[in-house]
């Protein structure tokens, strides 16, 4: 007879916990808390987390990372000015700021460079990385000039007719002699 009462008490307790405790109406279920990138913890949250609501278990809180912590975990930074064309937007931070992360591929291409496949083309030099194994390649002035049949000179000669076909460096033109069409 005593076992019957114990069985009823255990079943009643399980039913009470699974249906939520009185006074926790409007609280998050564990699934709802997880959907908000949170977790149900007993009373306190882990460091760098904040309570974003109550869970439907008595004494449990729905804890989630702060917007700054979420942004930092995605290797982004919170900026008040918003994201640029070369950034990936990871959503809002506190105070109207945006979580932005520089996209290496967009950044490389935005500045007129190309992403190489394993290595840079002959007339380019690596200046960074688009993705692992794919360098960001910039045209190298002297190498590019040479590949086009030109020479880097302080001044293009006036005696032999030449065209300026590019720039090797600041103030140093890439000169190529004009071909006679004979």
UniProtKB/Swiss-Prot annotation:
Subcellular location as annotated: Secreted
Spans through the membrane: none
Keyword Secreted in record: yes
GO molecular function: CCR6 chemokine receptor binding; chemoattractant activity; toxin activity
Gene Ontology cellular-component terms listed: extracellular space
InterPro entries in alphabetical order: Defensin_beta-like
SUPFAM superfamilies, A to Z: Defensin-like
C(6)C(4)C(9)C(6)CC repeats: 27-64, 65-101, 102-138, 139-176
Record flagged with keyword Calcium: no
Tissue-specific expression: Expressed by the mandibular venom gland.
One Pfam family this sequence matches: Defensin_beta
Major localisation: secreted
Signal peptide: 1-26
GO BP of this protein: cell chemotaxis; defense response to bacterium
Alphabetical UniProt keywords: Repeat, Secreted, Signal, Toxin
Protein family per UniProt: Belongs to the beta-defensin family. Helofensin subfamily.
Protein role: Lethal toxin which possesses an inhibitory effect on direct electrical stimulation of the isolated hemi-diaphragm of mice. Neither hemorrhagic nor hemolytic activities are detected. Phospholipase A2 activity, proteolytic activity and arginine esterolytic activity are absent.
Protein name, per record: Helofensin-3
Upper taxonomic lineage: Eukaryota, Metazoa, Chordata, Craniata, Vertebrata
């Amino acid at each position: 007879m005593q076992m019957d009462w114990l069985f009823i008490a255990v079943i009643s307790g399980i039913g009470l916990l699974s249906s939520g405790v009185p006074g926790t109406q409007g609280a998050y279920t564990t699934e709802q808390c997880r959907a908000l990138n949170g977790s149900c913890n007993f009373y306190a949250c882990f460091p760098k987390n904040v309570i974003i609501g109550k869970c439907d278990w008595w004494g449990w809180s729905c804890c989630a990372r702060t917007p700054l912590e979420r942004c930092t975990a995605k290797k982004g930074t919170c900026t008040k000015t918003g994201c640029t064309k070369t950034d990936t937007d990871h959503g809002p931070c506190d105070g109207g700021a945006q979580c932005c992360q520089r996209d290496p591929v967009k950044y490389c291409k935005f500045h007129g460079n190309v992403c190489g496949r394993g290595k840079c083309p002959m007339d380019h030099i690596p200046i960074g990385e688009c993705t692992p194994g794919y360098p960001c390649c910039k045209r190298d002035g002297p190498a590019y000039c040479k590949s086009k049949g030109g020479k880097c000179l302080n001044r293009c000669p006036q005696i032999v007719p030449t065209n300026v076909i590019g720039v090797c460096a600041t103030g140093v033109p890439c000169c190529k002699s004009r071909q006679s069409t004979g």
